Amino acid sequence: MNKYLKYFSGTLVGLMLSTSAFAAAEYAVVLKTLSNPFWVDMKKGIEDEAKTLGVSVDIFASPSEGDFQSQLQLFEDLSNKNYKGIAFAPLSSVNLVMPVARAWKKGIYLVNLDEKIDMDNLKKAGGNVEAFVTTDNVAVGAKGASFIIDKLGAEGGEVAIIEGKAGNASGEARRNGATEAFKKASQIKLVASQPADWDRIKALDVATNVLQRNPNIKAIYCANDTMAMGVAQAVANAGKTGKVLVVGTDGIPEARKMVEAGQMTATVAQNPADIGATGLKLMVDAEKSGKVIPLDKAPEFKLVDSILVTQ
């Protein structure tokens, strides 16, 4: 069984990418993973938009958000399958630079989703993308932190940030947005900012240590909901549910339920379905234009807004 996964019609199957030189559909999408509801929602948005546009699309994902080599090989294989266009969400800003450059040189229409590829290095490698579609992740982090600041009021207090994976542009942008917001509030003291690699169990462990070292902490902002759920468990284990604010990011269904139940305080909800749908439409529109974006032209930049979900 090949470790790459292809998802279609609600069914999970193994795909041996080397069995055919031809694409099964007109377009392909490479997501980070499908073990996180955020990416499942994006997949659904892409599928719905494909039906609206009347196009066919194959959707692929790496086994995990840390498997950089697998995603690189997956993209390389797909770029040899005669797809008209490929939309992709890189696991880091640099892991797909070279294969994306090669795909652009082949005349494939390329759209970057969520995690921004390193455009400086991509241009140096001789490649470009039609568009970049994402949420303003600095604003997302700032929105979560600002909510915490408002909730704590004039009294303020100690807060912490649970970051994503080191080197991940989306996570770093959220951390930076939250950090700047906290620093601007004189009544707030940021006592810890540590990565938990987007992982629930790691976040549980990190938050447990943060809570033990900082018994007066009043709030924790998390760069995604998967980690926030682990943090909420750590807060519960410490007997501090409702006493320590837990704010996540993404607005996945399980996190929303935890907010409703009072186990989490809030989540900054992205719209992954809209990100995926917008990316597919931009890719199809670019292909219909009949001309791949020139190397010296700036990609179209599309921001999808976020909303704060509270009780």
Swiss-Prot record:
Biological process according to GO: D-allose transmembrane transport; D-ribose transmembrane transport; transmembrane transport
A GO molecular function held by the record: monosaccharide binding
Record keyword Transport present: yes
Keyword NADP among record annotations: no
UniProt main location, coarse: periplasm
UniProt entry keywords in alphabetical sequence: Periplasm, Signal, Sugar transport, Transport
InterPro entries for this protein: Peripla_BP_I (IPR028082), SBP_2_dom (IPR025997)
Main function: Part of the binding-protein-dependent transport system AlsBAC for D-allose.
Name recorded for this polypeptide: D-allose-binding periplasmic protein
Source species of the chain: Escherichia coli (strain K12)
